[in-house]
């Protein structure tokens, strides 16, 4: 078992038959007009749900969805999720509209084997984001076992993630968190070499802690996306109007020096797709070299950069990908991200994708199925990799006497 799971029980460690299992999931899926647009987080939760059902547990499930301000924000209702779960599980999912009520307590005695309870969006309750012990105790009163399988929310000290397991004796994790931590630990402990971290996205500042943690573990970095312009400017190269964090120029310069001093590699773009504005596809063109004209900004990496990055990725034994290479949501600026996604997919390496934008980029590229693991964690996976303790996991190591 991976190191990060030391002292934490899994759902397999409990006798579930006839027991009320409170299962905290991350069903925070994107929606448009009440329709689910990406159900990955739902399907990722199914193995634990099915296992609990097969073992004869009575299930009370819970999740958050978005950031509702009040209970009247019905666009954040879990109703579409409940309907989708019914289809996927071939079971009746009873949606309890008041998570803070005694309704589950009254429903549980007569719950049939193919019926499950899903609490409405827990963030409709004020006590959830306040880590309220009072709200948690209400749930604990009718629950025998607590299982957290919401990796994407485990970095938040919220009531159903933190306060609830703090008042329950029997607690552990589901299969999704077990897999997530095992995969992320493999990036920190004895990775197959060469090990390359592909970093992209907008800001260097968002990635500093992860870069620092990985610097002693990886063999090389590939840096693309808008954050690359800060590194290029730090080397005195012209980046035009591209997004640059001027307060991070010194850090970027020092980081390059530190990487090279450790005999590790850092690959930066050598050409770009540049244009006059981020929505301006008409003037988009590939630069001849690394320089970007004064009145232009970079929106993607160019073909020479894709070729360089792909050649390095072909040789890799382990790849961690976090962040797109350009504004991939615009098809005109997606070639860099999709080219790198293809190179990662074609590689024989262990390929782990972490961070929300990278997961979306992997999906959009059509290569998601070829990745070893795409983390459902977003912010949680980065916080874990940078060495932060996740409240939702740490509380599971504590024992109630």
Swiss-Prot record:
Enzyme class: transferase
Gene3D superfamilies: Phosphoglycerate kinase, N-terminal domain
GO cellular component annotations of the record: cytosol
One Pfam family of this chain: PGK
Presence of the UniProt keyword Plastid in the record: no
Known catalytic reactions: (2R)-3-phosphoglycerate + ATP = (2R)-3-phospho-glyceroyl phosphate + ADP
Entry superkingdom: Bacteria
Residues that coordinate or bind substrate: 26-28, 41, 64-67, 123, 156
InterPro entries in the record: Phosphoglycerate_kinase, Phosphoglycerate_kinase_CS, Phosphoglycerate_kinase_N, Phosphoglycerate_kinase_sf
Transmembrane domains' residue ranges: none
Description of how the protein assembles with itself and partners: Monomer.
Protein name per Swiss-Prot or TrEMBL: Phosphoglycerate kinase
Highest classification ranks of the organism: Bacteria, Pseudomonadati, Bdellovibrionota, Bdellovibrionia, Bdellovibrionales
